[in-house]
């Protein structure tokens, strides 16, 4: 959840900087979908269609940074979400706010198709309660993380923009408190946006080189980092204790250009919850140490990078979960080489824990 809060803070700071460098618009989207029962224990929960409305403040980039042109002018924004997730009696209503980025996959004249990735916070009024609401096995906390992944098609005519989209919206507390099977809702949406502050795309002389705010990384070289990670998670059964998680990540990163990078990494993880897994077996700290090899696709937006990765355990003596793990989230790189890491570690659709980390890139140099 802190990952999503910090993502919002980054977006708000960017919005204050965007008075002259971005085109501004207001957008409303209406969404209709269903609650996906991705675990058998959730089969009783979907009862009605899920619906939601989203009101967004939109910032359309106009080229003042080099990566804007590389991505064909991405869009940023902040969204207010309100909806019913498919079972009013058990799950109640959800309110959320999130920041997002839309990266064009196709852009031709007045038409564009975007990939959208958003992170934020959500609130629900019917969390799990052992007496009042024991059937809600999806969410045990009122405040949760919110994630939205979407494909969106937009046609713009002058100051008006019409869009349709497919997305999946997710609520979870990342196993901070159980039960936490999470809420997953596939949606289809239609929307309308109106430009309120028009700004033309910046024009560049091809002989003058890059835009006036170049990327803060160089390409065709490897960057080497180490990151220390701290987290916590609660284990089943319900009402159990919360355990700390300690980890180190050693990584090498290579960027192929403004739009893509590769990360190869080694993870060392000390998940204290394993001490109580199969409690009849005596364990040491060395016994519970997990090691994993990991690869990720990086999406660099200047110093802010999205991370989408997958790994496999090389050492996992007790195998309390699946042999494969996944990581999705974001990092921010400071000018002095320090990096801030906020990612969600999962085993497929099941959250493991949030990774709060701080690291250092040894050969980082700004241009």
Language model region names:
Residues 55, 184-205, 351-367:
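Outer-membrane beta-barrel "beta-signal"
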Residues 64-67, 109-113, 157-164, 198-202, ...:
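Repeated loop/turn-to-beta-strand initiation elements of outer-membrane beta-barrel proteins
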Residues 38-43, 89-92, 127-133, 174-181, ...:
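Outer-membrane beta-barrel translocator domains and adjoining extracellular loop/strand segments
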Residues 30-36, 59-61, 80-86, 119-127, ...:
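Transmembrane beta-strands of outer-membrane beta-barrel pores
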Residues 22, 47-53, 72, 91-97, ...:
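Residues that define the transmembrane beta-barrel architecture of outer-membrane proteins
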Residues 24-28, 74-76, 113-119, 162-166, ...:
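Transmembrane beta-strands of outer-membrane beta-barrel proteins
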Residues 28, 55-59, 99-105, 117-121, ...:
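Residues on the lipid-exposed face of transmembrane beta-strands in outer-membrane beta-barrel proteins
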Residues 19-62, 205-253, 361-363, 367:
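Short glycine/proline- and aromatic-enriched beta-strand/turn motifs that initiate or cap beta-hairpins
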């Amino acid at each position: 959840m802190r990952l999503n809060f910090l993502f919002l803070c980054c977006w708000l700071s960017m919005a204050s900087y965007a008075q002259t460098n971005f085109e501004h618009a207001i957008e409303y989207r209406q969404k209709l979908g269903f609650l996906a029962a991705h675990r058998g224990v959730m089969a009783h929960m979907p009862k009605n269609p899920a619906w939601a409305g989203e009101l967004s403040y939109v910032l359309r980039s106009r080229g003042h940074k080099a990566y804007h042109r590389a991505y064909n002018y991405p869009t940023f924004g902040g969204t207010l979400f309100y909806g019913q997730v498919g079972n009013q009696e058990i799950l109640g209503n959800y309110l959320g706010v999130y920041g997002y980025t839309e990266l064009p996959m196709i852009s031709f004249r007045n038409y564009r198709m975007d990939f959208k990735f958003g992170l934020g916070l959500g609130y629900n009024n019917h969390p799990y309660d052992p007496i009042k609401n024991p059937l809600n096995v999806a969410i045990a906390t009122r405040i949760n993380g919110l994630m939205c992944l979407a494909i969106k098609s937009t046609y713009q005519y002058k100051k008006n923009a019409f869009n349709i989209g497919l997305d999946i919206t997710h609520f979870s507390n990342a196993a901070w408190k159980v039960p936490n099977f999470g809420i997953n809702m596939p949606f289809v949406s239609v929307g309308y946006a109106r430009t309120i502050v028009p700004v033309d795309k910046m024009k560049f002389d091809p002989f003058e080189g890059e835009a006036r705010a170049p990327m803060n990384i160089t390409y065709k070289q490897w960057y080497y980092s180490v990151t220390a990670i701290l987290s916590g998670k609660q284990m089943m059964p319900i009402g159990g204790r919360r355990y700390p998680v300690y980890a180190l990540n050693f990584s090498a990163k290579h960027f192929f250009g403004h739009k893509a990078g590769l990360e190869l990494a080694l993870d060392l993880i000390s998940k204290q919850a394993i001490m109580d897994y199969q409690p009849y077996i005596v364990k040491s700290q060395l016994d519970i140490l997990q090691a994993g090899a990991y690869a990720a696709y990086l999406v660099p937006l200047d110093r802010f990078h999205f991370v989408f990765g997958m790994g496999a355990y090389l050492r996992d003596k007790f195998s309390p979960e699946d042999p494969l793990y996944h990581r999705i989230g974001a990092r921010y790189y400071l000018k002095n080489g320090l990096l801030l890491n906020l990612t969600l570690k999962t085993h497929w659709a099941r959250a493991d824990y949030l990774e709060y980390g701080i690291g250092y890139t040894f050969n980082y140099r700004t241009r």
